[in-house]
Amino acid sequence: MTFLPELGQNIRFARKKQFPRDNMKAFSLRVGISRATYQKMEKGDLSVSLKHYYQAAKLLRVENDFTRLFLLKESLFDD
């Protein structure tokens, strides 16, 4: 099971909220990728580079959340 379809839905929601006049083509130009690549991102296609997801996250101002993907919280039991 993959989380990318949900990620794609989140990207689509954020695009429509922050750039309500942008269709997929207009937003893909903002990100610097082709419409076809962006369409794959919204579908959760595994072939899309993580770099493109980060570019979209940066444009949508959620890159800080993106960079925390693998951040481990410190435990009281850690040295």
Regions found by a protein language model. Name each.
Residues 22-24, 50-53:
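Helix-turn-helix DNA-binding elements, focusing on the entry/boundary residues of the two helices
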Residues 1-20, 69:
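A short, Lys/Arg-rich alpha-helix, primarily the initiator
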Residues 15, 28, 57:
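The alpha-helix within a helix-turn-helix
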Residues 67-79:
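Short, charged recognition helix plus adjacent turn
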Residues 19-39:
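Short alpha-helical DNA-recognition segment
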Residues 51-68:
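DNA major-groove recognition helix of helix-turn-helix/homeodomain DNA-binding modules
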